Protein backbone atom coordinates (compact mmCIF):
# COMPACT_ATOMS: atom_id res chain seq x y z
CA UNK A 1 0.00 0.00 0.00
CA UNK A 2 1.33 3.41 -0.93
CA UNK A 3 1.64 5.97 1.82
CA UNK A 4 1.49 9.67 1.25
CA UNK A 5 2.06 12.79 3.27
CA UNK A 6 -0.63 15.47 3.31
CA UNK A 7 0.93 18.90 2.83
CA UNK A 8 0.35 21.34 5.68
CA UNK A 9 -2.54 23.78 5.26
CA UNK A 10 -0.90 27.21 5.36
CA UNK A 11 -2.74 30.52 5.33
CA UNK A 12 -0.35 33.19 4.02
CA UNK A 13 -1.31 36.80 4.74
CA UNK A 14 0.75 39.68 3.36
CA UNK A 15 0.30 43.42 3.18
CA UNK A 16 1.78 46.80 4.07
CA UNK A 17 2.06 48.24 7.57
CA UNK A 18 -1.23 48.94 9.40
CA UNK A 19 -3.30 47.28 6.67
CA UNK A 20 -5.08 45.14 9.25
CA UNK A 21 -3.31 41.92 8.28
CA UNK A 22 -2.15 41.18 11.83
CA UNK A 23 -5.60 41.64 13.34
CA UNK A 24 -7.10 39.52 10.58
CA UNK A 25 -4.44 36.81 11.00
CA UNK A 26 -5.09 36.55 14.74
CA UNK A 27 -8.85 36.36 14.18
CA UNK A 28 -8.42 33.61 11.57
CA UNK A 29 -6.01 31.66 13.78
CA UNK A 30 -8.42 31.82 16.72
CA UNK A 31 -11.44 30.82 14.63
CA UNK A 32 -9.78 27.79 13.04
CA UNK A 33 -7.61 26.85 16.01
CA UNK A 34 -4.41 27.26 14.00
CA UNK A 35 -1.00 28.35 15.35
CA UNK A 36 -0.13 31.90 14.26
CA UNK A 37 3.22 33.52 13.50
CA UNK A 38 3.58 37.27 13.04
CA UNK A 39 6.81 37.20 11.02
CA UNK A 40 7.37 40.92 11.53
CA UNK A 41 8.05 40.17 15.18
CA UNK A 42 11.00 37.96 14.21
CA UNK A 43 12.87 40.97 12.82
CA UNK A 44 11.97 43.00 15.89
CA UNK A 45 13.21 40.17 18.13
CA UNK A 46 16.58 40.17 16.36
CA UNK A 47 16.84 43.94 16.80
CA UNK A 48 15.94 43.69 20.49
CA UNK A 49 18.55 40.98 21.04
CA UNK A 50 21.21 43.32 19.66
CA UNK A 51 19.93 46.33 21.61
CA UNK A 52 19.81 44.36 24.87
CA UNK A 53 23.49 43.44 24.48
CA UNK A 54 24.54 46.90 23.33
CA UNK A 55 25.66 45.51 19.97
CA UNK A 56 25.79 47.36 16.67
CA UNK A 57 22.67 47.30 14.50
CA UNK A 58 24.91 47.63 11.44
CA UNK A 59 26.89 44.42 11.94
CA UNK A 60 25.32 41.77 9.68
CA UNK A 61 27.30 38.91 11.23
CA UNK A 62 26.10 39.74 14.75
CA UNK A 63 22.53 40.23 13.54
CA UNK A 64 22.62 36.89 11.71
CA UNK A 65 23.87 35.12 14.85
CA UNK A 66 20.93 36.62 16.74
CA UNK A 67 18.55 35.45 14.00
CA UNK A 68 19.92 31.90 14.06
CA UNK A 69 19.46 31.62 17.84
CA UNK A 70 15.95 33.12 17.90
CA UNK A 71 13.20 31.18 19.68
CA UNK A 72 9.99 31.88 17.75
CA UNK A 73 7.84 30.64 20.63
CA UNK A 74 9.36 33.04 23.15
CA UNK A 75 8.56 36.32 21.38
CA UNK A 76 6.58 38.86 23.44
CA UNK A 77 4.44 41.00 21.13
CA UNK A 78 3.80 43.65 23.79
CA UNK A 79 7.51 44.18 24.41
CA UNK A 80 8.49 43.97 20.74
CA UNK A 81 5.87 46.54 19.68
CA UNK A 82 7.91 49.44 21.11
CA UNK A 83 8.60 52.16 18.53
CA UNK A 84 12.37 52.13 19.16
CA UNK A 85 12.52 48.40 18.45
CA UNK A 86 10.56 48.91 15.24
CA UNK A 87 13.06 51.52 14.08
CA UNK A 88 15.95 49.19 14.89
CA UNK A 89 14.21 46.29 13.13
CA UNK A 90 14.06 48.25 9.88
CA UNK A 91 17.87 48.26 9.86
CA UNK A 92 18.38 44.53 10.34
CA UNK A 93 15.48 43.61 8.03
CA UNK A 94 17.40 44.76 4.95
CA UNK A 95 20.36 42.46 5.67
CA UNK A 96 20.28 39.47 3.23
CA UNK A 97 21.84 36.99 5.65
CA UNK A 98 19.37 37.93 8.39
CA UNK A 99 16.44 37.58 6.00
CA UNK A 100 17.67 34.16 4.85
CA UNK A 101 18.00 32.92 8.43
CA UNK A 102 14.58 34.19 9.48
CA UNK A 103 12.84 32.99 6.32
CA UNK A 104 14.22 29.51 7.00
CA UNK A 105 12.94 29.64 10.59
CA UNK A 106 9.52 30.89 9.47
CA UNK A 107 9.31 28.21 6.78
CA UNK A 108 10.20 25.51 9.30
CA UNK A 109 7.46 26.79 11.63
CA UNK A 110 4.87 26.49 8.85
CA UNK A 111 5.97 23.12 7.50
CA UNK A 112 6.29 21.44 10.90
CA UNK A 113 2.59 21.91 11.69
CA UNK A 114 -0.59 20.42 10.17
CA UNK A 115 -1.92 23.94 9.70
CA UNK A 116 -0.86 27.50 10.48
CA UNK A 117 -1.42 31.18 9.78
CA UNK A 118 1.55 33.40 8.93
CA UNK A 119 1.42 37.11 8.28
CA UNK A 120 4.11 39.45 7.04
CA UNK A 121 5.44 41.05 3.88
CA UNK A 122 6.67 38.07 1.84
CA UNK A 123 4.84 34.98 3.06
CA UNK A 124 3.04 34.15 -0.18
CA UNK A 125 5.96 35.09 -2.42
CA UNK A 126 9.03 33.84 -0.52
CA UNK A 127 8.39 32.07 2.78
CA UNK A 128 5.48 29.82 1.75
CA UNK A 129 5.00 30.13 -2.03
CA UNK A 130 2.99 26.87 -2.00
CA UNK A 131 0.56 28.00 0.73
CA UNK A 132 -2.96 26.63 0.32
CA UNK A 133 -4.49 30.12 0.48
CA UNK A 134 -2.85 33.52 0.04
CA UNK A 135 -4.37 36.83 1.04
CA UNK A 136 -2.92 40.26 0.29
CA UNK A 137 -4.49 42.75 2.68
CA UNK A 138 -4.24 46.43 1.89
CA UNK A 139 -5.87 49.81 2.55
CA UNK A 140 -5.19 53.40 1.52
CA UNK A 141 -2.24 55.13 3.24
CA UNK A 142 -4.62 57.61 4.87
CA UNK A 143 -6.81 54.88 6.36
CA UNK A 144 -3.77 52.96 7.59
CA UNK A 145 -2.30 56.10 9.14
CA UNK A 146 -5.61 56.82 10.90
CA UNK A 147 -5.63 53.29 12.35
CA UNK A 148 -2.08 53.63 13.61
CA UNK A 149 -2.88 57.11 14.99
CA UNK A 150 -5.90 55.76 16.89
CA UNK A 151 -3.84 52.85 18.25
CA UNK A 152 -1.26 55.22 19.68
CA UNK A 153 -3.92 57.43 21.28
CA UNK A 154 -5.66 54.37 22.73
CA UNK A 155 -2.40 53.50 24.51
CA UNK A 156 -2.45 56.93 26.13
CA UNK A 157 0.48 58.22 24.07
CA UNK A 158 0.64 61.34 21.91
CA UNK A 159 0.83 61.16 18.12
CA UNK A 160 1.04 63.36 15.06
CA UNK A 161 -1.16 62.15 12.20
CA UNK A 162 0.88 63.85 9.46
CA UNK A 163 4.07 62.32 10.84
CA UNK A 164 2.53 58.84 10.96
CA UNK A 165 1.23 59.18 7.38
CA UNK A 166 4.63 60.33 6.11
CA UNK A 167 6.35 57.47 7.95
CA UNK A 168 3.96 54.89 6.47
CA UNK A 169 4.50 56.19 2.94
CA UNK A 170 8.27 56.08 3.46
CA UNK A 171 8.00 52.53 4.79
CA UNK A 172 5.85 51.47 1.81
CA UNK A 173 8.45 52.88 -0.55
CA UNK A 174 11.23 51.00 1.21
CA UNK A 175 9.30 47.72 1.39
CA UNK A 176 8.15 47.77 -2.24
CA UNK A 177 11.50 48.77 -3.71
CA UNK A 178 13.97 46.70 -1.71
CA UNK A 179 16.04 44.24 -3.73
CA UNK A 180 15.48 41.27 -1.43
CA UNK A 181 11.85 40.10 -1.11
CA UNK A 182 10.02 43.30 -2.13
CA UNK A 183 6.46 43.76 -0.90
CA UNK A 184 4.08 42.64 -3.65
CA UNK A 185 1.07 40.33 -3.96
CA UNK A 186 1.74 36.76 -5.06
CA UNK A 187 0.28 36.09 -8.51
CA UNK A 188 -2.30 33.74 -6.99
CA UNK A 189 -3.12 35.89 -3.95
CA UNK A 190 -6.63 37.13 -3.23
CA UNK A 191 -6.64 40.92 -2.78
CA UNK A 192 -8.54 42.24 0.22
CA UNK A 193 -8.86 46.04 0.42
CA UNK A 194 -9.96 46.87 3.96
CA UNK A 195 -10.13 50.66 3.49
CA UNK A 196 -13.90 50.66 4.00
CA UNK A 197 -14.29 47.31 5.76
CA UNK A 198 -14.78 46.54 9.43
CA UNK A 199 -12.67 43.83 11.05
CA UNK A 200 -15.73 41.56 10.99
CA UNK A 201 -16.39 42.18 7.28
CA UNK A 202 -12.74 41.51 6.43
CA UNK A 203 -12.81 38.30 8.48
CA UNK A 204 -15.99 37.05 6.78
CA UNK A 205 -14.52 37.75 3.33
CA UNK A 206 -11.34 35.88 4.27
CA UNK A 207 -13.29 33.03 5.90
CA UNK A 208 -15.23 32.38 2.70
CA UNK A 209 -11.97 32.01 0.76
CA UNK A 210 -10.34 29.87 3.44
CA UNK A 211 -13.34 27.55 3.78
CA UNK A 212 -13.22 26.93 0.02
CA UNK A 213 -9.47 26.24 0.14
CA UNK A 214 -9.92 23.91 3.12
CA UNK A 215 -12.56 21.91 1.27
CA UNK A 216 -10.20 21.49 -1.69
CA UNK A 217 -7.28 20.63 0.59
CA UNK A 218 -9.25 17.85 2.26
CA UNK A 219 -10.31 16.51 -1.12
Swiss-Prot record:
Its EC number is 2.7.4.25. Its main location: cytoplasm. It is found in: Cytoplasm. GO terms for molecular function: ATP binding; CMP kinase activity; dCMP kinase activity. It comes from the Bacteria. One of its GO terms (biological process) is pyrimidine nucleotide metabolic process. InterPro entries: Cytidylate_kin (IPR003136), Cytidylate_kinase_dom (IPR011994), P-loop_NTPase (IPR027417). Keywords: ATP-binding, Cytoplasm, Kinase, Nucleotide-binding, Transferase. One of its GO terms (cellular component) is cytoplasm. ATP binds at residues 15-23. It catalyses: CMP + ATP = CDP + ADP; dCMP + ATP = dCDP + ADP. CDD domains: CMPK. Belongs to the cytidylate kinase family. Type 1 subfamily. NCBIfam families: cmk (TIGR00017). This is Cytidylate kinase. It comes from Brucella canis (strain ATCC 23365 / NCTC 10854 / RM-666). The gene is cmk.
Amino acid sequence: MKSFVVAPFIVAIDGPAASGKGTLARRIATHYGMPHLDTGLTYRAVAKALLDKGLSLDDEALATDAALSLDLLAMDKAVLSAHAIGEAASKVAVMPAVRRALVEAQRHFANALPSSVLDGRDIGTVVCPDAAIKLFVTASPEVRARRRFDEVLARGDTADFAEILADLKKRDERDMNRTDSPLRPAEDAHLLDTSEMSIEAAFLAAKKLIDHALAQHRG
